[in-house]
Amino acid sequence: MRLHLTFNHSTPATGRKNTKHTLFFGSMLACIISIISLVVPAYGANVSDEKKAKPFTHDNVIDLAMQLAQKPFKEARKAPKELIDLDYATYGKINYQENAAIWGGTPTKFSVQLFAPGFLYKNLVDIDVVENSRAFPIELTESSFSVPNDTIEKLLTQVGQYAGVRLHYPINDDEVKDEFIMFQGASYFRALSKGQTYGLSNRGLAIDVAQPKGEEYPLFKRFWIERPSKYQTAIVVHALLDSQSVTGAYRFGIYPGAPTRVDVDVTLFPRRDIAHVGLAPLTSMFLYGGLDTPDKPDYRPAVHNSEGLQIDRGNGERLWRPLNNPNKLQISAFGDEDIKGFGLIQRHRNFDYYQDLGANYQQRPSAWIEPLNDWGKGQLILLEIPSNAETNDNIVAYWEPQGGLKQAEPYRYSYRITASNDSPSFTNKARVIRSSKGQKQAKGKELLIDYSNIKPQDIEKITIDASISKGKILSSRIVAHPEINGARIFITFEPESTNVAELRIQLRKDEKPVAATWLYRWNSDDWP
């Protein structure tokens, strides 16, 4: 839409300024400018002209996903080989021009920057901005990126598409728009709260994880980003997901802050029956810490993006499972119905626990998943994959619905992701803050667990309910731990004629749980 405005304004013949008329004209002009700002896009650089704009609502994404599911899967367009062959260092020199940021020079608190294709990011994606219920494609031009050489600039311009998107907002400083969420690679995305640095990742969907035929990685192939008004502190991103087995329409309501929250609504259209599908998947890294000690000398006491899995079961029970870096692939399943929440948690928030000046693991976010509609029966799956490097993601957690997904039936799921420092449901409650191997025993193995937020006067009233699936609990005791305003328990156990045993420990007071039930899988390969 183009608006042509003509004003015929003349000064009175007397030469005196007509103040009343001028004030009226100024007010009228201000109103017209305000109206223009509502109907004319203020997107910034690299957005196509209005002739390419199309009406848009989330229903359009659902319709696209439904239509796509009725057609055979078609691989996404790939970046040219020259870009894919770039090494990490060269790709890292390709940066989106800050002065090209979408909405960067407008009153909107948010701005949008984009990722170039290349290196690991082979798939090309389309990105639109939505203003006044119309979608405008963002076009890649020679001014979109700063690049290390002319060859790369030419290749990017010829490609004309991007590999992902990141959003900026004054989350830490009112005067600085920091990156706080990114979508890049397959269906991966990561979010930050105030004061955090990137760690674990979220994914749109997981299919056939750890199955013999190999995992399938769905792709967000197109994004639509709604422009907020200058007063809004939230933003909406829509995404179209596609893979060999399923299509999906996603809506992300994103609320940056302390903590950042992402409300996800997804409608899935399976192309085939899918037995093993993962909802709200989380991917993280655990190298060592707590019960798991390093294989070789390291000045850092712990190295991980997440240290534990927390589950709030449908029956009200809370579970805490310390993570492990096993010698062999380890898969755990926690059956449930109407699960209340789950997450991978980074609980320790002090530098001394990690001693890493570069990685700052104490600033890595936790991710808490809270279903907002009925997820029914299923199981929470935890994968722990052997790893010898902190650059490898080796922890995966997701909800697997019972019965999987059936072909041609639509499925709708809603959930909330909170990028908190801890799980929201554990605020001001007794919680496990340390799990460790104890001293060497003449008989059995000693386990030590520290709990915070337990009053000294309650210690004598607490009982320890400890069990092992194969073996015996030899002893258990609890003592006050004034350094953490909590308690420390010691458990001695003896596995019998087995390589694997499940430990379960619960503190109770007046027959009621004091804290989350502590779970752990003892393995003779990891703890001889």
Swiss-Prot record:
Q: Which gene does this sequence derive from?
A: opgG2
From the UniProt record, give the pathway where this protein acts.
Glycan metabolism; osmoregulated periplasmic glucan (OPG) biosynthesis
Q: Does the keyword Glycoprotein apply?
A: no
Please name the SUPFAM superfamilies in this protein's record. Answer: E set domains, Galactose mutarotase-like
Name it. Answer: Glucans biosynthesis protein G 2
Q: Name one Pfam family in it.
A: MdoG
Q: Which GO terms describe its cellular component?
A: outer membrane-bounded periplasmic space
The record describes the protein's role as: Involved in the biosynthesis of osmoregulated periplasmic glucans (OPGs).
A single GO BP: beta-glucan biosynthetic process
Q: What is its main location?
A: periplasm
Keywords attached to this Swiss-Prot or TrEMBL record, sorted alphabetically, are: Periplasm, Signal
Provide the protein's localization. Answer: Periplasm
Origin superkingdom: Bacteria
Q: Which HAMAP family match?
A: MdoG_OpgG
Q: Which family does it belong to?
A: Belongs to the OpgD/OpgG family.
Q: What start and end residues bound the annotated signal peptide?
A: 1-44
One GO MF term on file is: carbohydrate binding
